[in-house]
Amino acid sequence: FASQYTEAELKKFEAGIYYDVYKKMGAHPMVINGVSGVSFSVWAPCAMRVSVVGDFCQWDGRRYQMNRLGDSGVFELFIPGLGEGDIYKFEIKNQKGEPMLKADPYGNYSEMRPNTASVVWDMNKFSWSDDAWMAAREKIDTKKKPMSIYEMHLGSWIRKHTEKDEEGNDIVGSEFYNYRQ
């Protein structure tokens, strides 16, 4: 299957100005030349090899080795027959030849803990309901507005646990904010 990236897109990516790269990176269900499957891509500039692994190949990194796109550090592969709900990771072979399993940094969905694999998910099926907010955002000059970056280590704030999940595990941070992922 042909690359899903154009030369112009790779140049924009290398320059750090490819603002829609999330539409290509990660796992995206699609049909190419009448064949249904999933297009995978990841940036791993120092990798010797990158493979897509999952139950569909018994987690064998030799089966679905990705194609390196020139010197961009981007690897990609289209795997026919895969689709929404399939779990996967990237097997990245480092400079020492050691394979490491990594979740997809652009993944849209993940397994529930304690498992850590990414899950193929079609984000095109999601119906966004933020049209008014997006329209208002276009009228704002963000370069002239303040920006807030909030970073904290929740562990350093723990004094007591006030909430537990369905399995009886403590939910950290329940007293600090009302949304957690």
Predicted ranges, named:
Residues 46, 60, 84-86:
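Short loop/turn segments at connectors of secondary-structure elements within structured domains
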